[in-house]
């Protein structure tokens, strides 16, 4: 649905709004990166299995484990230890995930009022976090041992934050300012 919405109406409206000479100049979604930090995995090697399974269910794609670049004694992390997992979504899976995120997960999120414009990075990319991964319907609350958060980065081809915000507003992203 999001892909058709983008192709049918958003491209035309953004082209007119920003006076692009060509539809290839219109900003589009490039990829969505989802990251889940798992601090428990530094001491318990089996602690990463549950977040990997959860991220697989949420994204529909096999996630990769992420490893510590250097040792940090304060966090009891050694270089090369597993510290999280990530997945990068593109094309159809990206649009399916964003649709489930906006219409299902975000309304179920506690104390969610919308996104801020300050969450843009200055280059047209948008980043935010979710406190509870159980907001997604794919996760069975009875089968998980710990509620975890996740970071979501939306990378666009937009040159400025203004263009990226208009693209995300057209895709029904809830902004409060």
From Swiss-Prot:
InterPro entries the UniProt entry points to: Ribosomal_uL5, Ribosomal_uL5_bac-type, Ribosomal_uL5_C, Ribosomal_uL5_CS, Ribosomal_uL5_dom_sf, Ribosomal_uL5_N
UniProt keyword tRNA-binding, yes or no: yes
GO biological process: translation
Alphabetically ordered keywords of this record: Ribonucleoprotein, Ribosomal protein, RNA-binding, rRNA-binding, tRNA-binding
Gene Ontology terms for molecular function: rRNA binding; structural constituent of ribosome; tRNA binding
Cellular component GO terms, alphabetical: ribonucleoprotein complex; ribosome
Physiological role: This is one of the proteins that bind and probably mediate the attachment of the 5S RNA into the large ribosomal subunit, where it forms part of the central protuberance. In the 70S ribosome it contacts protein S13 of the 30S subunit (bridge B1b), connecting the 2 subunits; this bridge is implicated in subunit movement. Contacts the P site tRNA; the 5S rRNA and some of its associated proteins might help stabilize positioning of ribosome-bound tRNAs.
Family from the record: Belongs to the universal ribosomal protein uL5 family.
Binding partners and assembly: Part of the 50S ribosomal subunit; part of the 5S rRNA/L5/L18/L25 subcomplex. Contacts the 5S rRNA and the P site tRNA. Forms a bridge to the 30S subunit in the 70S ribosome.
Protein name: Large ribosomal subunit protein uL5
């Amino acid at each position: 649905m999001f892909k058709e919405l983008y192709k049918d109406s958003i491209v035309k409206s953004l082209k007119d709004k920003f006076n692009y000479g060509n539809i290839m100049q219109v900003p589009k979604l490039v990829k969505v990166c989802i990251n889940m930090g798992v601090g428990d995995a530094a001491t318990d090697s089996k602690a990463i299995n549950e977040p990997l399974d959860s991220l697989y269910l949420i994204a529909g794609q096999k996630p990769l484990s992420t490893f510590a670049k250097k040792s940090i004694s304060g966090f009891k992390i050694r270089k090369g230890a597993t510290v999280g997992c990530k997945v990068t979504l593109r094309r159809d899976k990206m649009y399916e995930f964003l649709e489930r995120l906006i219409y299902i997960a975000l309304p179920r999120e506690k104390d969610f009022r919308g996104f801020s414009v300050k969450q843009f990075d200055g280059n047209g990319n948008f980043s935010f976090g979710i406190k509870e991964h159980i907001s997604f319907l794919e996760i069975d609350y009875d089968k998980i041992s710990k509620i975890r958060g996740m970071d979501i980065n939306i990378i666009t081809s937009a040159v400025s934050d203004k263009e990226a915000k208009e693209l995300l507003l057209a895709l029904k992203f809830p902004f409060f300012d």
